[in-house]
């Protein structure tokens, strides 16, 4: 390697270094200017310490290699440790408290959890929009301050259920924000001053600590308030308080909880408010882009409430936010340091521990990546098809690797929602068209002095916007979104009959549900649902070419919230003639409210009639106090509405009404896909289940089932059972990879066996039905996991497991899933995880019912495996046994017959060949089928040779399986049973014997006699039991020939 080059940079002065080369008010701009002068890597000296800055994508790509570099906490960020200590953002590399908090919190920021926060995000965003709407289009809006209010209130509400209500105090920012801004600014100042200068700034230091204590006091108050709540919501704060680290089993300390509450409140709002501020600055500076973004929102959302699905369908908004962050990364850098001395870019030597700052405002404008127009705002470059082609680590505004922003998904959903909602609601212009962008710097950046004006779009009013937000809040969905025909929304199957419009007034959702039910019924009669919407949507919008059905109630004597405008419209007397409109009204009420009983349905019916509308049918009514509303609706439909509709509005040609299938549903059934991947599987239906053991004993179960056809089974044969994985194990996988159960996964691979190919499968189904989750990890799996972690500590531990594979991994049955939970820093893609999993295999069980005993039926006798895992933590759940234990009478499962080895069947001549059966626990299963087969022969008056059953268990009242049945068989002369009780050998029936080998000794003479008659000995059970029995028998009988001594070990 050639000699390392000297890192360029401005020449430092003695003592002060480059302090005077930097504008203290605009330090970031000064440092970015150095990048233009000195190239991709430069250094400056501040306070006697060298600070190195990387400014190109190529160097950032190297610095993001977590095998070589890790996060460094320096300068301003290190000063913030006074506030947040080892919180997620300020912790040193490898700090233990950070590890515990990170492992607890990562699952809580999964996509489903973030998606579920959308309603609370919308709540706060609507407060912002209402504020702007009420201020009017002439008001100058400090957009940065309002976005700070917005994002602070959002993070507090969504993650902690805590309302700061910042929009209700327009004069000052929340005290937490005031303290935060001071602390951030002071940290930035201290980072750029020599230590001696900081030491004499006593007043500033005192004020710094005062503000820190104020912030921690507020965080402590939030925590104390939550702890008083006996029914806390399942949010991030609840996770902080009650979560357990999957590695150490520890929870977070109170100080760590406070540190991370503060971290969320700062990091969760400060950078997002900057992102939104810069985004709207760029949009207003580029009206054609603003117009295009607004058109995307109009086309996708309209006036509906913005949903998570809408956000996924706004690619241009997504690109705008990415481009805004590229040009103005609100957290303008992050710092890493090499684990050992490294040569960066093949030119510059960086010593171990030397911090290197990734200067994002320069890196993200690298012309070699973004082209000669890299300084221009052009969102198209960030559309998915272009973004995916960028070189690695070209866009890093959220940091890197395991120390990257844990709340990225939260911030992104919030930003998308706010941009879409503002564009949906307002037209925007700058307050000062001559404004030139100025940057306000703390440890983050925001526009300084940027103000706008916002005017409501499309004739909306502040009152209308307020009412719309209230309707959304009460009904949970936008009323306007229901204006379109139901067929277009997929609420109902398409039909071609006479159209009908349904309007409802509903606060609690009852009348809305009744309307949906009636519309569904009408479709089965040959009518088409044209509209299904709240009554307020019918103002000046009642159709004349089709019947109108209204279903509504009275709320405190008044119309429901979504019927107020409609009733007011009718009451004003300004209604144009409703002549030509045909209608019917169905009203709901409760007779306890005697003064207002059916008031609004009656009022609507009368007013419409007086305005010239034609009443199709007498008004229907349902009294919730004495009847079922849906039954009353059906009665009105049959006796009043349908006859009137048939007389005046003929439906399309339709079949007669089928009461068993009123909606004419057509469907087809097929067996589960997993069944097709195994040959010869037969469907069985469970007919009986029972637990055979006492509650305080390891559980054993009996499961009886029926099937069709003759399977040519014999006593002693086996069944291969197709199981599914335990739900708790599947849940562990879903949590590990932040998947909702109904996420779809499509596998496209020629190398993956046992999985549906090129077919969407839900995550729950895939991990339940197609792969082994608890198979011990292989050596190759360990190699892959080593490659997937950046942590040297974890690598060392995994290498230790690799070196002691047989004893630590294989013998203790440690799975890949176990290892991922044990070492959360392993970053394993889900595709790699799936590729490590073998196909789910069938499990083999012995028949415990003789085929001749009950034709077309059989049974299984099995132990339910639920025991402490051999790895030392958690539970080991037997896949098939827990699946079988979950089945109930009527359940369907799948099996295939599997013959036992030929010697493990009854003798060809049961009249002349005695048998001796030796077993313990569920090893009784095949011998039960032997005995039942002999019982059938006995009932046929056929002679039988002697049969002995030696059975071991814990005790008579614990797990003496099938005691009553065996007693009946014994009384019939089919078998003689000899028992051993390991827990209660003092029982007479056990003859003092704990184990079957002991009982063999006490029955030695009988065994010798049967052996002399060419008896066959069968053994079924565990290895230890079989070895003990064999030792006794060899000592008693001598050599045991294979054809007369047959074993089946499990």
From Swiss-Prot:
Note on how the cofactor is bound: Binds 1 FAD. Binds 1 FMN.
Region Disordered, annotated ranges: 461-495
Gene Ontology MF terms: aromatase activity; flavin adenine dinucleotide binding; FMN binding; heme binding; iron ion binding; NADPH-hemoprotein reductase activity
Reactions this protein catalyses: 2 oxidized [cytochrome P450] + NADPH = 2 reduced [cytochrome P450] + NADP(+) + H(+); an organic molecule + reduced [NADPH--hemoprotein reductase] + O2 = an alcohol + oxidized [NADPH--hemoprotein reductase] + H2O + H(+); dodecanoate + reduced [NADPH--hemoprotein reductase] + O2 = 5-hydroxydodecanoate + oxidized [NADPH--hemoprotein reductase] + H2O + H(+); tetradecanoate + reduced [NADPH--hemoprotein reductase] + O2 = 7-hydroxytetradecanoate + oxidized [NADPH--hemoprotein reductase] + H2O + H(+)
Annotated ranges, domain Flavodoxin-like: 500-641
A GO term from the CC aspect: cytosol
Keywords: Electron transport, FAD, Flavoprotein, FMN, Heme, Iron, Metal-binding, Monooxygenase, NADP, Oxidoreductase, Transport
Residue sites binding heme per the record: 405
Role this protein plays: Self-sufficient cytochrome P450 monooxygenase that catalyzes the regioselective in-chain hydroxylation of alkanes, fatty alcohols, and fatty acids at the omega-7 position. Performs hydroxylation of C10-C16 n-alkanes and C12 and C14 fatty alcohols; and thereby enables the one step biocatalytic synthesis of rare alcohols such as 5-dodecanol and 7-tetradecanol. Converts 1-dodecanol into 1,5-dodecanediol as major product with very little sub-terminally hydroxylated products with the 1,4-dodecanediol and 1,6-dodecanediol more abundant.
Protein name: Self-sufficient cytochrome P450 monooxygenase CYP505E5
Species in which this protein is naturally found: Aspergillus kawachii (strain NBRC 4308)
């Amino acid at each position: 390697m050639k000699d390392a080059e000297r890192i360029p940079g401005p020449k430092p002065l003695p003592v002060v270094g480059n302090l005077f080369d930097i504008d203290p008010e605009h330090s970031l701009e000064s440092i970015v200017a150095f990048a233009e002068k000195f190239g991709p890597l430069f250094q400056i000296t501040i306070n006697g310490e060298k600070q190195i800055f990387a400014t190109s994508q190529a160097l950032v790509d190297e610095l993001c290699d977590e095998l070589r570099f890790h996060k460094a906490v320096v300068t301003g960020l290190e000063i913030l440790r006074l506030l947040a200590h080892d919180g997620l953002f300020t912790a040193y590399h490898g700090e233990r408290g950070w590890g515990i908090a990170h492992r607890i919190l990562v699952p809580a920021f999964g996509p489903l959890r973030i998606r579920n926060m959308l309603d609370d995000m919308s709540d706060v965003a609507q407060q912002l929009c209402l504020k702007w709407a009420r201020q009017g289009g002439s008001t100058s809006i400090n957009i940065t301050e309002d976005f700070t209010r917005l994002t602070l209130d959002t993070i507090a509400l969504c993650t902690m259920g805590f309302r700061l209500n910042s929009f209700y105090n327009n004069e000052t920012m929340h005290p937490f924000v005031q303290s935060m801004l001071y602390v951030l600014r002071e940290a930035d100042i201290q980072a750029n001053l020599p230590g001696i200068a900081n030491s004499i700034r006593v007043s500033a230091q005192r004020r710094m600590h005062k503000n820190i204590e104020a912030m921690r006091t507020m965080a402590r108050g939030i925590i104390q308030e939550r702890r008083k709540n006996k029914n806390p919501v399942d949010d991030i704060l609840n996770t902080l308080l009650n979560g357990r680290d999957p590695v150490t089993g520890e929870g977070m300390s109170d100080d760590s909880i406070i540190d991370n509450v503060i971290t969320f409140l700062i990091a969760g709002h400060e950078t997002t408010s900057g992102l939104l501020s810069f985004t709207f600055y760029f949009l207003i500076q580029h009206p054609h882009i603003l117009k295009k973004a607004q058109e995307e929102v109009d086309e996708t959302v309209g006036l509906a409430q913005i949903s998570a699905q809408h956000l996924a369908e706004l690619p241009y908004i997504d690109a705008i936010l990415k481009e805004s962050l590229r040009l103005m990364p609100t957290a303008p850098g992050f710092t890493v340091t090499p684990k050992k001395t490294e040569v960066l870019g093949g030119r510059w030597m960086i010593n171990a521990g030397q911090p290197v700052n990734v200067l994002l405002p320069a890196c993200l404008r690298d012309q070699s990546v973004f082209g000669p127009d890299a300084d221009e705002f052009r969102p198209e470059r960030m559309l998915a098809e272009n973004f995916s082609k960028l070189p690695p680590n070209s866009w890093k505004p959220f940091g890197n690797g395991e120390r990257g922003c844990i709340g990225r998904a939260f911030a992104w959903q919030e930003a998308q929602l706010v941009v879409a909602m503002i564009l949906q609601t307002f037209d925007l212009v700058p307050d000062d068209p001559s404004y030139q962008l100025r940057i306000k710097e703390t440890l983050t950046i925001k526009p300084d002095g940027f103000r706008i004006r916002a005017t409501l779009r499309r004739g909306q009013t502040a009152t209308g916007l307020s009412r719309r937000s209230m309707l959304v809040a009460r009904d949970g969905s936008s009323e306007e979104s229901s204006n379109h025909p139901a067929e277009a929304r997929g609420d109902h199957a398409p039909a071609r009959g006479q159209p009908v419009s349904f309007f409802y007034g509903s606060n609690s959702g009852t009348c809305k549900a009744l309307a949906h039910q009636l519309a569904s019924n009408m479709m089965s009669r040959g009518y088409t649902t044209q509209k299904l919407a709240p009554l307020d949507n019918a103002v000046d919008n009642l159709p004349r070419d089709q019947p109108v059905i209204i279903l509504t109630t009275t709320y405190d004597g008044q119309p429901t919230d979504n019927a107020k405008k409609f009733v007011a419209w009718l009451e004003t007397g300004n209604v144009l003639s409703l002549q030509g409109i045909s209608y019917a009204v169905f009203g709901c009420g409760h007779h306890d409210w005697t003064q207002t009983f059916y008031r609004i349905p009656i009022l609507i019916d009368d007013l419409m009639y007086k305005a010239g509308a034609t009443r199709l049918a007498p008004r229907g009514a349902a009294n919730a106090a004495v009847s079922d509303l849906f039954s009353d609706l059906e009665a009105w439909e049959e006796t009043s509405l349908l006859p009137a509709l048939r007389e005046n509005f003929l439906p399309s040609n339709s079949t007669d009404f089928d009461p068993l299938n009123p909606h004419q549903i057509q469907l087809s059934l097929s067996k589960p896909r997993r069944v097709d991947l195994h040959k010869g599987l037969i469907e069985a239906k469970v007919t009986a289940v029972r637990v055979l053991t006492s509650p305080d004993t390891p559980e054993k179960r009996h499961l009886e089932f029926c099937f069709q056809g003759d399977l040519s089974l014999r006593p002693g044969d086996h069944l291969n059972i197709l199981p599914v994985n335990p739900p708790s194990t599947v849940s562990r996988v879903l949590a590990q990879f932040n998947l909702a159960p109904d996420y779809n996964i499509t596998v496209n691979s020629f190398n993956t066996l046992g999985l549906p190919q090129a077919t969407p499968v839900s995550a729950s189904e895939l991990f339940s039905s197609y792969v082994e989750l608890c198979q011990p990890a292989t050596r190759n799996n360990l190699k892959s996991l080593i490659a997937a972690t950046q942590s040297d500590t974890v690598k060392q531990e995994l290498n230790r497991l690799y070196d002691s594979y047989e004893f630590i991994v294989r013998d203790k049955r440690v799975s890949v899933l176990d290892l991922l939970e044990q070492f959360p820093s392993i970053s394993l893609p889900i595709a790699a995880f799936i590729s490590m999993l073998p196909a789910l295999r069938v499990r083999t069980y012995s028949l415990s019912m003789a085929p001749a005993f009950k034709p077309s039926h059989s049974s299984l006798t099995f132990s339910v495996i639920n025991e402490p895992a051999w790895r030392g933590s958690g539970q080991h759940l037997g896949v098939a046994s827990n699946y079988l234990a979950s089945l109930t009478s009527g359940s369907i499962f799948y099996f295939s017959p599997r013959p036992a080895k030929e010697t493990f069947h009854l003798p060809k001549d049961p009249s002349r060949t005695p048998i001796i059966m030796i077993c313990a626990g569920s090893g009784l299963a095949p011998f039960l089928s032997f005995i039942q087969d002999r019982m059938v022969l006995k009932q046929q008056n056929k002679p039988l040779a002697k049969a002995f059953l030696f059975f071991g268990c814990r005790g008579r009242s614990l797990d003496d399986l099938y005691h009553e049945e065996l007693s009946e068989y014994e009384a019939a002369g089919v078998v003689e049973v000899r028992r051993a009780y390991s827990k209660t050998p003092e029982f007479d029936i056990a003859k003092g014997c704990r184990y079957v080998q002991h009982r063999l000794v006490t029955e030695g003479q009988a065994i010798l006699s049967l052996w002399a008659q060419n008896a066959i000995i069968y053994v079924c059970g565990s290895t230890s039991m079989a070895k003990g029995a064999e030792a006794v028998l060899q000592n008693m009988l001598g050599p045991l020939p294979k054809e007369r001594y047959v074993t089946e070990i499990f």
